[in-house]
Regions:
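Hydrophobic/anchoring residues in structured secondary elements
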Residues: 35, 64-66, 101
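Surface-exposed, charged secondary-structure patches
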Residues: 44-92
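Short, low-complexity N-terminal intrinsically disordered segments enriched in polar/charged residues
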Residues: 1-19, 24-27, 31
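Hydrophobic pocket/interface hotspot
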Residues: 13, 24-26, 33, 44, ...
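Short beta-strand segments enriched in hydrophobic/aromatic residues
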Residues: 29, 75-77, 103
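Short beta-strand edge/turn micro-motifs at domain boundaries
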Residues: 84-107
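A short gly/proline-enriched turn/hairpin at secondary-structure junctions
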Residues: 28-42, 50-51
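Short hydrophobic/aromatic-rich beta-strand segments that constitute the beta-sheet cores
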Residues: 35, 71-73, 98-99
Length: 107
């Protein structure tokens, strides 16, 4: 990571993505976690399998605020190549209860 993420659950999620560790990814989430991509709610499991784990996915954080609760990253997978993305996380009891992601504007 080139930017500092200090929230342990967010660190764990990023590490899981970069290691291709599906179990660790879901362990960083609450059981009822939800997500949206480009403003549309998605089935989290289906989305993660398609976007992060079938590819394989990589995530390089470029900038982060609020301990990583809001960040800009370069995401890479075999389907879409490299995209500049935003991520916003909501935490509950030390885990991620929701994240919103989508394409970010140019740097």
């Amino acid at each position: 990571m080139t930017a500092e993420v200090t929230e342990p659950a967010i660190q764990a999620l990023i590490h899981a993505i970069n290691e291709g560790d599906r179990s660790a990814f879901f362990a960083a989430l609450t059981p009822d976690a939800s997500m949206s991509d480009d403003g549309r709610d998605r089935d989290l499991t289906q989305w993660a399998d398609r976007e992060l784990f079938s590819g394989p996915g990589r995530m390089e954080v470029k900038s982060a605020t609020d301990g990583g609760r809001s960040l800009i990253a370069e995401n890479t997978n075999d389907t879409y190549g490299t995209m500049r993305t935003f991520w916003r996380f909501t935490l509950r009891d030390g885990k991620i209860s929701r994240y919103e992601t989508g394409q970010a504007g140019p740097a």
